[in-house]
Amino acid sequence: MADVSLKLSAKDIYEKDFEKTMARGYRREEVDAFLDDIITDYQKMADMNNEVVKLSEENNKLKKEVEELRLRVATSRPSDNKSFSSNNSSSSNNNVDILKRISNLEKAVFGK
C-alpha cells in the first residue's frame, strides 16, 4: 500500500484557527492551503478504503478456494485399502498436489 501517514487529524481540523485580516475575514491563501491538505488526506483515506475492500474480497475468495480444496481432499480419500492400493500412485500424486495447493493458499490467506 501507498504512504498511509495522514497530515491532519480530526482534532487538527476542529482546532484550526485562521488568521483574520483587517477586512474582517480570513486570509484566502491560508484557507485554500488548509483545504488542500484536507483534500489530500481524504483522497488517501478513499484509496486505502478501496484497497481494504479489494483485499477483503480477495481474502474471502481464497478462503472459499481453500475450503473447496479441503473438501475435495476429504472426499477423494479412499474408503478402503483395496481401492487405495490400486490407485495409490495416481491418487497419491493428486493428493500431494492438492495438499501443496492448500498449503500455498493458506500461506497467501493467513500469512503462515
Curated annotation (Swiss-Prot):
Q: Name one Pfam family in it.
A: DivIVA
Keyword set, alphabetical order? Cell cycle, Cell division, Cell shape, Coiled coil, Cytoplasm
GO BP term (any one):
cell division
Q: Where in the cell is it found?
A: Cytoplasm
Q: What is its main location?
A: cytoplasm
| Ranges of Low complexity composition bias in the record | 81-95
- Name residues in a coiled coil: 42-77
Q: What GO cellular component entries does it have?
A: cytoplasm
InterPro entries registered for this protein in UniProt: Cell_cycle_GpsB, DivIVA_domain, DivIVA_fam
- Cite the residue spans of the region called Disordered: 75-97
Assembly, per entry: Forms polymers through the coiled coil domains. Interacts with PBP1, MreC and EzrA.
In which family does this protein belong, per the annotation?
Belongs to the GpsB family.
Q: What role is this protein assigned?
A: Divisome component that associates with the complex late in its assembly, after the Z-ring is formed, and is dependent on DivIC and PBP2B for its recruitment to the divisome. Together with EzrA, is a key component of the system that regulates PBP1 localization during cell cycle progression. Its main role could be the removal of PBP1 from the cell pole after pole maturation is completed. Also contributes to the recruitment of PBP1 to the division complex. Not essential for septum formation.
- What is the protein's given name? Cell cycle protein GpsB
Instruction: Name the species this protein comes from.
Output: Staphylococcus haemolyticus (strain JCSC1435)
